[in-house]
């Protein structure tokens, strides 16, 4: 189980924290030292350092929420893992269940909530403006995990034409992956886990332990490393966060086993080493051509699930770590304007211990962040106010650089 792991790593940190041992600390490697050095030296961008967050509670008493996709008007389509239901959460805090048409019952009938499995990721076709939206869902069934497509009608709060577009993804009570997201190229990316069998991650014929790239019809997307395969990258243990920065660079968060959790920059066809390598700088990984993470944490401090990537940072919602990690993107927009990929600043934590387990994070339309807590999933402790539980909640964060 990813966030009930024992053991604390002694981390040997490369480059920025080279040579430090003894106390568990996050580590950082910058793949763009020129951009990093120039941004850090100038001191011109206050977002290169830590930020603080003002927090508002938008909605509460959500039953085991897992994924969320943004709709126009700062509304969010949220999946409930165990109930296999969908709801639209409005900025006012109103929560409307999606219970019209035949789709919701079909979704319940074919979803199996088993441990970490159930109704997981959700994505909305980015070109849709409503009231009809094409939505994509990742669910655990009796035999496999699958990606589904359906039509969402916000006027009638209905779901219809539920269709399986990709199946055969290994399933288990643990390590199901589940995050799905549209990339800037217009294709759908699917994060899968090794389903408790590490060999899946290194098997090119298995869809487990991979990041997949498909068309909206579920076919391998044009330009994939193997034209006949949906596999985009491999060697993953359990990816649950996907995002892209303004330079088009792709990021993924990944659960480690008992040493190190990871933030990776994803390249097509690359192998990220699981189960041979966990974390950075291992000679076996270097010799085998595995890719190192760009940032890593002891598992006690992270267990990263969803991520959000903005112009100024990568944000990781952490379960066992009960905090929101921020990795600054040094120089942000100015680095991109100069044709550089921003480097990485020192990771720092927000919301540490304040709201418990954090499952997902999304960027809003006005620079704010939205964060889903996850204390009702059987591993957390729901918060009680006035004698009744208030978890789980959708939080809105306003961010300000620390002067």
Feature roles, as predicted:
Residues 1-8:
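Bacterial N-terminal signal peptides that target proteins for export
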Residues 8-14:
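Sec-dependent N-terminal signal peptides
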Residues 16-19:
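C-terminal motif of bacterial Sec signal peptides marking the signal peptidase cleavage site
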Residues 21-197, 241, 249-256, 301-336, ...:
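Acidic, Gly/Ser/Thr-rich repeat motifs that build Ca2+-stabilized beta-propeller blades
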Residues 96-114, 162-176, 216-233, 271-299, ...:
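Surface-exposed loop and turn segments in beta-propeller and other repeat-based domains
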Residues 231-262:
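Repeat-solenoid scaffold signature
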Residues 357-360:
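Repeated scaffold domains used in trafficking and secretory/extracellular systems
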């Amino acid at each position: 189980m990813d966030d009930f792991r024992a053991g604390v790593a002694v981390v040997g940190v490369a480059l920025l924290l080279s040579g430090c041992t003894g106390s568990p600390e996050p580590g950082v490697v910058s793949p763009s030292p020129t951009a990093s050095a120039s941004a850090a030296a100038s001191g011109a961008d206050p977002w290169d350092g830590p930020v603080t967050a003002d927090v508002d509670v938008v909605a509460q008493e959500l039953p085991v929420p897992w994924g969320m996709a943004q709709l126009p008007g700062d509304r969010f389509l949220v999946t409930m893992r165990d109930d296999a239901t969908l709801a639209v959460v409005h900025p006012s805090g109103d929560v409307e269940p999606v219970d019209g048409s035949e789709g919701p019952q079909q979704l319940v009938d074919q979803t199996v909530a088993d441990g970490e499995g159930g109704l997981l990721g959700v994505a909305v076709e980015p070109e849709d403006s409503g009231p009809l939206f094409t939505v994509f869902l990742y669910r655990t069934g009796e035999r496999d995990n699958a990606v589904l497509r359906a039509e969402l009608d916000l006027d009638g709060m209905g779901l219809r034409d539920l269709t399986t577009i990709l199946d055969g993804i290994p399933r288990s009570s643990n390590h199901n992956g589940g995050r799905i997201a549209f990339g800037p190229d217009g294709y759908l990316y699917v994060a899968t886990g090794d389903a408790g069998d590490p060999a899946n991650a290194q098997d090119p014929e298995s869809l487990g332990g991979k990041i997949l790239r498909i068309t909206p019809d579920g076919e391998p997307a044009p330009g994939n490393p193997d034209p006949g395969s949906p596999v985009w990258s491999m060697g993953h243990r359990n990816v649950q966060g996907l995002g892209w920065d303004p330079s088009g660079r792709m990021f993924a968060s990944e659960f480690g086993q008992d040493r190190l959790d990871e933030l990776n920059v994803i390249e097509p066809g690359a192998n990220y080493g699981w189960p041979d390598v966990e974390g950075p700088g291992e000679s076996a990984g270097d010799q085998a051509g595995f890719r190192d993470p760009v940032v890593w944490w002891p598992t006690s401090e992270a267990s990263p699930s969803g991520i959000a990537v903005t112009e100024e940072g990568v944000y990781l919602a952490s379960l066992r770590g009960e905090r929101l990690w921020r990795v600054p993107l040094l120089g942000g927009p100015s680095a991109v304007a100069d044709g550089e990929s921003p480097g990485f600043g020192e990771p720092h934590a927000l919301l540490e211990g304040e709201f418990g387990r954090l499952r997902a994070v999304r960027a809003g339309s006005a620079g704010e962040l939205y964060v889903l807590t996850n204390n009702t999933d059987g591993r957390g402790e729901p918060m009680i106010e006035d004698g009744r539980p208030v978890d789980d909640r959708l939080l809105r964060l306003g961010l300000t650089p620390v002067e």
